[in-house]
Every structure is written in structure tokens, then in C-alpha cells.
């Protein structure tokens, strides 16, 4: 093997070994998904690209009641982000599920409790709102201005 290639391969291996020691960020999205499943009867995946606000980002006016649930959830996360050190997308929390009831169990006023309450409220809202298949995967450039 060419010595230059061997040197590059060694550097890549060392970098990968170093990266293996970095703990992964725990995303609360898994917990949010489980809350959605607990509170409702629809598959959680149907909310990923729904309307203008369900999924990453959001703009314009929510297209319906379900999309408004996502809009409110986005704003709730925005409020949580105002707490120093609180990242709602990575903050894990404690809760119980006795289908369809959800209970957040972290101490009131903590980042974890606030994020849990955001997710709980959204999951309950999703379960109550009608689902319009025509608003799944809509064009944001056309419908969300």
C-alpha cells in the first residue's frame, strides 16, 4: 500500500476512535413519538410532514386544527428555549402513559417538565384534531406563505 494512503487511513481510524468516545445526544423526539402513540390511535409518522408546522420548521398560517397543534407546540418549544441551558429538542424527561392518559412527572418549573408539558399538550391535541390527508406533505412554498 502507498505510504500516503496508509497515513490517511490511519488518521481516519484515529478520528473514528475518538468520535466513538463522544456520547450521543439523547433526543426527546423518541419520547414525543411515544406520547403521540399513547394519546392517540393514528401512526405518529403521519405528523412528520403535515401542514405548515408539523415537522421541521414552519411558516405562514396553520392550514387546520391539527397544524395549529404543531404551531402551538413549536411556540411552546420556543418558550422553553428562553430558559438558560434548556434545549427542548434534546432534553429528556420523565412521564407515565396509561393509554390514553399522559402524566409528566418531573418537578414543576424545570426544563424537563416544561418540555414534557409541551409534548403532552401536543400529543393530546393531535389525538383530538381531525386528520386531513390532503394536508400531508403539502408544498410549503404554495400553502405556507
From Swiss-Prot:
One of its GO terms (biological process) is arachidonate secretion. Its EC number is 3.1.1.4. It catalyses: a 1,2-diacyl-sn-glycero-3-phosphocholine + H2O = a 1-acyl-sn-glycero-3-phosphocholine + a fatty acid + H(+). Keywords: Calcium, Disulfide bond, Hydrolase, Lipid degradation, Lipid metabolism, Metal-binding, Secreted, Signal. Disulfide bonds join 38-97, 52-144, 54-70, 69-125, 76-118, 86-111, 104-116. Binds 1 Ca(2+) ion. It is found in: Secreted. SUPFAM superfamilies: Phospholipase A2, PLA2. GO terms for cellular component: extracellular region. Its cofactor is Ca(2+). SMART domains: PA2c. Residues 20-27 form a propeptide. GO terms for molecular function: calcium ion binding; calcium-dependent phospholipase A2 activity; phospholipid binding. The active site is at residues 73, 119. Its main location: secreted. Transmembrane segments: none annotated. Expressed by the venom gland. Residues 1-19 form the signal peptide. It comes from the Eukaryota. The keyword Oxidoreductase does not apply. InterPro entries: PLipase_A2, PLipase_A2_Asp_AS, PLipase_A2_dom, PLipase_A2_dom_sf, PLipase_A2_His_AS. Pfam families: Phospholip_A2_1 (PF00068). PLA2 catalyzes the calcium-dependent hydrolysis of the 2-acyl groups in 3-sn-phosphoglycerides. Belongs to the phospholipase A2 family. Group I subfamily. D49 sub-subfamily. This is Acidic phospholipase A2. It comes from Bungarus multicinctus. The lineage of its organism: Eukaryota, Metazoa, Chordata, Craniata, Vertebrata.
Amino acid at each position: 500500500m502507498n505510504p500516503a494512503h496508509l497515513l490517511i487511513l490511519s488518521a481516519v481510524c484515529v478520528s473514528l476512535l475518538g468520535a466513538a468516545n463522544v456520547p450521543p445526544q439523547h433526543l426527546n423526539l423518541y419520547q414525543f413519538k411515544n406520547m403521540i402513540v399513547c394519546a392517540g390511535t393514528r401512526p405518529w409518522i403521519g405528523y412528520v410532514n403535515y401542514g405548515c408546522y408539523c415537522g421541521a420548521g414552519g411558516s405562514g398560517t396553520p392550514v387546520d386544527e391539527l397544524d395549529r397543534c404543531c404551531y402551538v407546540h413549536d411556540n411552546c418549544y420556543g418558550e422553553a428555549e428562553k430558559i438558560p441551558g434548556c434545549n427542548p429538542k434534546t432534553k429528556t424527561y420523565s412521564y407515565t402513559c396509561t393509554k390514553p392518559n399522559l402524566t409528566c412527572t418531573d418537578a414543576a418549573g424545570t426544563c424537563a417538565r416544561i418540555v414534557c408539558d409541551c409534548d403532552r399538550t401536543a400529543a393530546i391535541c393531535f389525538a383530538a384534531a381531525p386528520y386531513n390527508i390532503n394536508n400531508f406533505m403539502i408544498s410549503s412554498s404554495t400553502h405556507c406563505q
